[in-house]
Swiss-Prot record:
Protein name, as recorded: Stage 0 sporulation protein YaaT
One Gene Ontology term, aspect cellular component: cytoplasm
Keywords: Cytoplasm, Sporulation
The keyword Cytoplasm is assigned to this record: yes
Organism: Bacillus subtilis (strain 168)
Function: Essential for the phosphorelay during initiation of sporulation. May control the level of phosphorylated spo0A through spo0E activity during sporulation.
Gene behind this protein: yaaT
Pfam families hit by this protein: PSP1
GO MF, any single term: mRNA binding
Length: 275
């Protein structure tokens, strides 16, 4: 077992484990840690706890110290420098005629590196741009190409539901989302209805998917023939979460709604699925 704390470096960012280095660190505290990018400032979202070896990536990097007001001042200064760096880089991108969109700029806490995040449809030769930026900022330069989902996460915005984007408020990682999830939930497959601001399938399609899959295993499919107290019927509609079925009575050409529980009480029997 390892004693660790969980640290985030960005809102809704991924959580990384660190060795607390003898410190007892409370939730919501801020710390200075050594990372692969250099010295960084992060927020503790998981206080000291014991985790299994399989849940950590070894070797664990250590906390340098608990952050104080002076460290927070440096963070704010870095944010202001990043705004200026964004404008400078934007002008250089135009000067070099590069087909890329600058999304964000970030200084590491110790200012040993400046990271420029961008999107582009293809590969971009930015070697000359890097040289220009290095001569201006006198530090290490990294240009990192990101995808459209990461862009939406960084910039934030309002989703089709009218709420702030999930990815920019609480989702630490992107999980795979498939068109099958929309089909299983009987949603419209119109891309404008099931796509987020990033143009990809909405992350929220994943949230209730397990419940839909479990419920669908218990309910008959649309098109399936069943026997009801009113005679044989064909399932023509299905509200999975409310467990309500619309069935068309074969002998009466009439559509009736039943809850699945009502059908079970009537001794419903599934027959064969029809085309």
């Amino acid at each position: 077992m390892y004693n660790v704390i969980g640290v985030r470096f960005k809102k809704a960012g991924k959580i990384y484990y660190f060795d607390p280095n003898g410190f007892h660190i409370e939730h919501d505290s801020c710390v200075i840690v050594e990372t692969v990018r250099g010295v960084e400032y992060g927020q503790v979202v998981i206080a000291n706890k014991q985790v299994d070896e399989h849940d950590v990536v070894l070797p664990l990097r250590k906390v340098i110290r608990v952050a104080d007001d002076r460290d927070l001042l440096i963070v704010e200064e870095n944010k202001q420098e990043a705004l200026s760096a964004f404008d400078i880089c934007q002008k250089k991108v135009i000067e070099h005629g590069l087909d890329m969109k600058l999304v964000d700029v970030e200084f590491t806490f110790d200012r040993n590196k400046v990271i420029f995040y961008f999107t582009a449809d293809g590969r971009v030769d930015f070697r000359e741009l890097v040289k220009d930026l290095a001569s201006i900022f006198k530090t290490r330069i990294e240009l990192r190409q990101i995808g459209v989902r990461d862009e939406a996460k960084m910039l934030g915005g309002i989703g089709p539901c009218g709420r702030m984007l999930c990815c920019s408020t609480f989702l630490g990682d992107f999980e795979p989302v498939s068109i099958k999830m929309a089909k299983d939930q009987n949603l419209s497959l119109n891309p404008t209805k099931i796509s987020g601001l990033c143009g990809r399938l909405m992350c929220c399609l994943k949230y209730e998917n397990d419940e839909y899959e479990t419920a669908k295993e218990q309910l008959p499919d649309i098109g399936e023939m069943i026997t009801t107290a009113n005679g044989p019927a064909k399932v023509v509609g299905l509200n999975i979460l409310e467990r309500v079925l619309q069935v068309e009575l074969i002998n009466r050409e009439k559509v009736i709604e039943y809850t699945w529980e009502e059908l079970l009480e009537e001794g419903v029997v599934s027959a064969q699925t029809t085309d």
